[in-house]
Amino acid sequence: MQKHRKFIGDKRFYLMVLGVAMPIMIQNGITNFVSLLDNIMVGQVGTEQMSGVAIVNQLLFIYNLCIFGGVSGAGIFTAQYFGQGNDEGVRNTFRFKLWIGVILTAAAITIFLGAHEPLIRLYLTGDQGSQDMNATLAYGISYMKVMLVGLPPFLFVQLYASTLRECGETMLPMKAGITAVFVNLVFNYILIYGKFGAPQLGVVGAAAATVLSRYVEMAIVLIRTHGNKEKYRFTKHLYRTIRVPAALTKQILIKGTPLMLNETFWAGGVAILMQCYSVRGLNVVAAMNISNTISNLFNVVFIALGDSVAIIVGQLLGAGRMEEAKDTDTKLIAFSVLLCIVIGALMALVAPLFPRLYNTTDEVRHMAAIFIVEVAMFMPVNAFLHASYFTLRSGGKTIITFLFDSVFIWVVSVPVAFCLSRFTGLSIYAIYFMVMSVDLIKCVIGFVLVKKGVWLQNIVAE
């Protein structure tokens, strides 16, 4: 019984964890639920529209994760500075995030404006001149051009929301996010279908609604944060300068560059995996889109608990409470895995139901249901990997997380998917299962690294 105690916390522990995780879970859950409804709305218009939107979102996902990686590199320091009570340290990490975010956003807009067609064509295999392919390409281009207008507000929401969360404030980003997703949902309905006298815009309407919701979310976060400077102390004199001390810049670049590269290469790896699967036909792209949208709804559990590891353990490390950090981390990982066994079983049970909501072929629905079951089987694995990743990251072990995450996907997962999809007669279901199975190797590596305690360090100690 004593041996099991290290994996199980008391009631106060779980209330503390849920206090951090639940707002993130609720925000991401509502966001992903509305994304599901958005996806169904676009799916009701047609398979080509749904596939075009899915391809563009896969490409924009790379930008999203570049921003996430850019702010997370500095965020390691933000959490520990906050734990230390150093407000100026928090301000300087925010300013670093601002610089890196503006550079990445400008680069993304330039690339997507200049090379949108060849990028979308990567996912359109088969007869490039076919009517279905040309329609999917046209819808994708129209959708992307509007979505690029929404990149600046997305950036500013990430800058503020990440800093607020690293300072233990999860409610404000949650409330802003919930408001935004409902704005998105309402205007999706109006603009996609042309309700209440509005023009029927289809995929362009879906993009316009998303962009509008992002500006609403940005306005809420900025106004509420700067309107309460006593509570959010880092906002005092935040823009008095945008200079970042050279010593801190060097520290963040050393610790944070591997993290940013990790997110970028990992997102690129995921995009290439999707391209490998798309070799098996446009139906696979549509089915994967349905599966991924539904999977994201369930994935909010282990994602929120992973974020909780970064926040809770990061603050304990910054305060120098190493033994408490180690004990807390063990309990958090165990809680995440056990909870995701239950969530995965629930997801597998409802797998056949969701694809029926889409206006697509029976083949695509059947394919999507099988993909959902396969993802459900690996949910506990993903929970362990996610918690391990954030454990290592909270202690500044970003080189290790770079090897653990993005190097692995490019050296192992992508070659496996590439070879199986192009040089074997295996079904797409078998290929998908085998590619996910190689993550078990990462589980072993993650277990060893976390158990050894290589992450137990205070990176902001004077």
Kindly give the residue locations of the regions a language model identified:
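Short runs within selected transmembrane alpha-helices of multi-pass transporters and secretion channels
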Residues: 71, 146-165, 173-181, 206-221, ...
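Hydrophobic/aromatic residues within transmembrane alpha-helices of membrane transport systems
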Residues: 26, 38-42, 53, 78-83, ...
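Generic alpha-helical transmembrane segments of integral inner-membrane proteins
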Residues: 25, 29, 33, 37, ...
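Helix-terminus/linker motif at the lipid-water interface of multi-pass membrane proteins
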Residues: 29, 33-51, 120-134, 192-201, ...
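Transmembrane helical elements of multi-pass membrane transporters/channels
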Residues: 19-38, 146, 180, 213-217, ...
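Small-residue hotspots at the loop-to-helix junctions and early N-terminal turns
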Residues: 47-58, 140, 144, 207, ...
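Short alpha-helical transmembrane segments in multi-pass integral membrane proteins
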Residues: 1-21, 78-150, 198-256, 313-378, ...
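Small-residue-rich hydrophobic transmembrane alpha-helices
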Residues: 50-110, 154-173, 285-351, 382-404
